[in-house]
Amino acid sequence: MTRQMSLRGRKGKPGRITFVGSGPGDPGLLTARARTVLANAALVFTDPDVPEAVLALVGCELPPPSGPLPAATEQPAKASGASGTADTSGVADKPPAEPDPSPVIPGGPDVRPALGDPAEVAKTLATEARTGVDVVRLVAGDPLSIDAVITEVNALARTQLTFEIVPGLPDTTAVPTYAGLPLGSAHTVADVRGDVDWAALAAAPGPLILHATASHLPEAARTLIEYGLADNTPTVVTANGTTCQQRSVETTLAGLMDKAVLAGAGPDGLPAATAGALVVTIGRTVANRAKLNWWESRALYGWTVLVPRTK
């Protein structure tokens, strides 16, 4: 989304900072409050992995632009005769137009990436809010399920600024549900893209749900096996969860160390270039997928249907 400077919503007092969870991917799973905040947002700082379908909702209910129209451009006088001299007869000299002092308010939201470490992001949010602008911090997933965002919130809590937190549906529960994997009341979630207590994770009650990218999976699997998990523990890797591009691959914990398993050359595999975040479900619940795989088993799922039309 193109960055546009916007003067919408500027007030004499500090603005509100609203953390909004984007949910697992499907914009239909956003909360009603999240949709309202995003639709009226003029300034948004977003995570890079927020889906485009969610970003498309930003600012969709902002009022139309206001302010003066651009000044009309004076047309040059027409040439008269073959001499090429301008015909100025009957045209009085006009003084230059005075500029209109009223401010022009450009249309469209201002969407920027949330850059830097959590302290830097929090400082940026606070700086903008102190100018009187309402600021939205759009977070992939659920705000208070992400350590870095918790740090941002804690930093803002030490200021006098007003903030709000709009939860998002965590992908660590939504994606297994869309993959037909019931988690029950006891399960363990870990993001293996950062520091992990592997001994505690391997001993934790299952099923295990991991946040990872494809590059993290071999080492994560190898380490979990070293700490006592069986190498044949059933595992499902899901990409693009809750969207129409969702793909899940069933394998074992040892299978995560095999690049061919994740390459997904066949129609049931992962996209060949799976660069984004994956949700990995590990444990006996994988056995339920055969009968509870309601999303990816739908008729024509994953097909592109062309509808011919006459001219």
Predicted features along the sequence, with ranges:
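Class I SAM-dependent methyltransferase SAM-binding "motif I" and its flanking Rossmann-like core
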Residues: 26, 140-205
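Glycine-rich, flexible N-terminal cofactor/catalytic loop recognition
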Residues: 7-70, 93, 98-114, 304-308
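A contiguous loop/helix-start segment that scaffolds small-molecule binding in enzyme catalytic cores
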Residues: 2-19, 70, 101, 120, ...
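General beta-strand structural signal in soluble alpha/beta enzymes
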Residues: 46-47, 136-140, 163-168, 183-185, ...
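Short gly/pro/ser/thr-enriched loop/turn and capping motifs at secondary-structure boundaries
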Residues: 51-53, 170-174, 217-218, 242-245
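Small-residue-biased low-complexity repeat regions
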Residues: 81-93
